[in-house]
C-alpha cells in the first residue's frame, strides 16, 4: 500500500461517519492535515479538512492542481476512468479482539 499523501491522491476515510468512502486530496494544510473532497455528488464525502491519521492512501492518483474545485476533480476522475471506483465503498478494517487479548 502506498504511504504517500499528495495532491490528487485517492484516499479512503477510515474513521468517522464517512468511514469506507473514497475521496481525493485537493490541498495539504500542514504535516498533520489535508483537505479532501469526494466530491459529495459522487462518493458522499464533502470538502473538508481531515487529519492524515483518519485516511488511508490508495495506489490511484489523478492529475489536478492544488485547491482544485469539485467540478475539476470530477472531470479528472472521469478522464481517468475512476468514477465507478469512487462510488464503491470499502469496509474499514477493524481490530480483531480475541479472548486472550482481554485481561
UniProtKB/Swiss-Prot annotation:
Record's keyword annotation contains Kinase: no
Superkingdom in the source lineage: Archaea
Listed transmembrane segments: none
The entry's keywords: Ribonucleoprotein, Ribosomal protein
Entry's Gene Ontology cellular component terms: cytosolic large ribosomal subunit
Keyword Ribosomal protein annotated: yes
One GO-annotated biological process of the protein: translation
Name of this protein: Large ribosomal subunit protein eL14
The encoding gene: rpl14e
